[in-house]
Design a protein with these regions (language model features):
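Hydrophobic targeting segments
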Residues: 2-6, 22, 31-36
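Short, well-formed alpha-helical segments that are part of the catalytic scaffolds
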Residues: 11-26
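Short, charged/polar "capping" segments at the starts of alpha-helices
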Residues: 13-15, 40-49, 100, 124-125
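Active-site-proximal specificity loops/subdomain of glycosyltransferases
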Residues: 36-84
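Short beta-strand-to-loop acidic/aromatic patch adjacent to the donor-nucleotide binding site
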Residues: 82-92
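A structural signal for short, well-ordered beta-strand segments and their strand-loop junctions
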Residues: 84-86, 113-118, 169, 205-211
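Conserved catalytic core of nucleotide-sugar-dependent glycosyltransferases
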Residues: 97-183
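C-terminal catalytic/acceptor-binding lobe
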Residues: 167, 173-250
């Protein structure tokens, strides 16, 4: 059983695309989905109210964020599934999963820390660094997935960075225990802290992914503080996208 945890801020329209892509391309991946969302003004809140009313998926629990750290840790602690898939609102499943969730779970053997839906042999660009990705050479494979030693990679590179909520599947208890063990104040800090500490905290030195990824992020804007690299090629401010969504144009 895999549950989903989605984080969203000011991007109801982009979240809608993610939910629609789950419905079309990964309808049986997630048993239950919790969405923790926040809005910085009334217009963004209207976007989320519109999205809720559309009921794109039947298995969603909505939670308005009050305190990010507390809400996030509680969501991990109260998650009833053995596995959890982290997602953020600018992710999209762009094609069908090549296998079932049972096979994904079966690939999470004792030596595997996480399963990445975002990585694959076709992953060629690391948008945060704005450069080409060093390709996997040393890996194991079967007909649908590849496995590699993430501890042999720099934590600044995708293949050495297992702690991500952009489509990574973890053992819920393991991720929960790690998250409660170290202090953080916001999402990027959580990723950075846990990414560094987990190299020492876990003996699971492998990551697994489909041979070709099924999900990517669309960084056309950034709502995080401090900001990430976003929108260099195709800048779409979240305010404009939200207004088009409210007006029925998106």
């Amino acid at each position: 059983m895999i549950n989903g945890l989605i984080l969203s801020k000011d991007r109801a329209c982009q979240l809608r695309l993610l939910l629609e892509s789950i419905r079309v391309n990964a309808p049986e991946l997630l048993d239950d989905i919790k969405i923790i969302y926040t809005s910085s003004n009334e217009n963004f809140e209207k976007g989320y109210e519109k999205l809720k009313s559309e009921q794109i998926l039947p298995n969603i629990t909505w939670q308005k964020e009050k305190d990010f750290v507390s809400d996030f840790l509680t969501a991990l602690k109260t998650c009833e599934s053995e596995y959890i898939c982290g997602l953020v609102d600018d992710c999209v499943f762009y094609k069908r999963l090549p296998t079932s969730s049972k096979q994904i779970i079966a690939s999470l053997t004792d030596d595997v820390f996480c399963f990445s839906l975002r990585m694959g042999l076709n992953t060629t660009t690391q948008y945060y660094m704005r450069n080409d990705v060093t390709q996997l050479v040393d890996y194991q494979q079967n007909p649908f997935c590849v496995k590699w030693d993430w501890k042999k990679w720099s934590s600044k590179l995708n293949y050495g960075y297992p702690i991500s909520l952009d489509g990574h599947i973890f053992r819920t208890k393991e991720l929960c225990d790690l998250s409660h063990k170290f202090k953080f104040d916001y999402l990027r800090q959580w990723e950075g802290v846990i990414a560094g500490k987990c190299r020492e905290e876990t003996d699971r030195d492998k990551m697994v992914a489909f041979r070709q990824n099924v999900l990517f992020s669309i960084p056309v804007n950034c709502v995080q503080d401090p900001p990430l690299v976003a929108g260099q090629l195709y800048d779409q401010p979240e305010e404009e996208i939200n207004q088009k969504y409210l007006d029925g144009e998106a």
